């Protein structure tokens, strides 16, 4: 949420979606490099080199976990030393003191037209999408006997599509087509993607479904973030985008739980088919969004 708030601070409304795309591209490269690093480093079994540490929790996946920890520490040090406040003092809003750890309060209406529908639509979309993400490796192993390296290739493919679509299409066309229309197109692409994955019995069908999903999410995420930012006054960007991202994080908690229970209780296809139907709700909600005013 901090990264997107910074983009909102330093871009004009008419260029907001282009700025958000760069955040999306960064995440896409994370999708490409992260699984590649994880898949390759998983082949290094630290238990063979440090057997005395097994009693302290060392396991076959400790190497990728250790690399992730080191990268997180580097990121923390870099941000501590280099990150500066991006919003000028005269544009900053007053501090909000009525913060709460109650997730229900995230759904409390905000007084900015369009923000509430966007927030709820984003929450519902991410519930379905994160459920797919979480159960995807289960399905790939159950139906096609995918190994950890096969899973890495799968997520590299997703990241490549996201980077290609956001860098080559969304960045150029979002300002012309409009963030609302592009978000609706993205949601519409997710539906056949989920259905194809639910039907997949071969890698070819699986990858076709993943291409739909990656393309759809590439359109939705930067455009919805941009819409929330455009609908919100500049001095409240951090608050509004923070709530938007918090609802996304909550969806990423609920979605995998529901999808996993559905997967193991009712079968591997059910969470994907039900997710496709469920996406009709945010598709309808987002179609009711007001056209953003860029002036």
What are these model-derived regions, one by one?
Residues 165, 178-224:
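C-terminal transmembrane helical hairpin of 12-TM major facilitator-type secondary transporters
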């Amino acid at each position: 949420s901090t990264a997107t708030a910074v983009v909102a601070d330093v871009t004009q409304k008419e260029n907001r979606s282009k700025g958000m795309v760069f955040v999306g591209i960064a995440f896409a490269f994370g999708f490409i490099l992260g699984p590649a690093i994880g898949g390759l480093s998983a082949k290094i079994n630290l238990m063979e080199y440090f057997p005395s540490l097994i009693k302290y929790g060392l396991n076959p996946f400790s190497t990728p976990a250790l690399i992730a920890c080191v990268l997180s520490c580097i990121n923390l040090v870099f941000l501590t030393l280099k990150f500066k406040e991006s919003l000028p003092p005269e544009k900053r809003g007053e501090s909000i003191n009525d913060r709460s750890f109650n997730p229900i309060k995230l759904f409390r209406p905000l007084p900015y037209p369009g923000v509430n529908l966007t927030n709820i639509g984003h929450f519902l979309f991410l519930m379905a999408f994160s459920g797919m993400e979480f159960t995807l490796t289960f399905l790939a192993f159950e139906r096609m006997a995918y190994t950890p390296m096969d899973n890495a290739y799968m997520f590299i493919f997703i990241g490549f599509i996201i980077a290609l679509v956001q860098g080559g299409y969304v960045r150029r066309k979002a300002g012309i087509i409009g963030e609302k229309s592009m978000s609706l197109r993205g949601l519409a692409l997710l539906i056949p993607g989920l259905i194809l994955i639910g039907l997949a019995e071969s890698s070819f069908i699986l990858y076709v479904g993943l291409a739909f999903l990656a393309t759809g999410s590439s359109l939705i995420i930067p455009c919805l973030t941009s819409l929330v930012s455009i609908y919100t006054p500049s001095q409240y960007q951090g608050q509004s985008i923070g709530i938007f991202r918090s609802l996304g994080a909550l969806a990423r908690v609920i979605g995998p739980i529901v999808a996993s229970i559905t997967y193991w209780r009712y079968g591997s296809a059910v969470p994907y088919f039900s997710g496709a139907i469920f996406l009709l709700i945010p598709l309808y909600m987002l179609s009711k969004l007001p056209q953003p005013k860029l002036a």
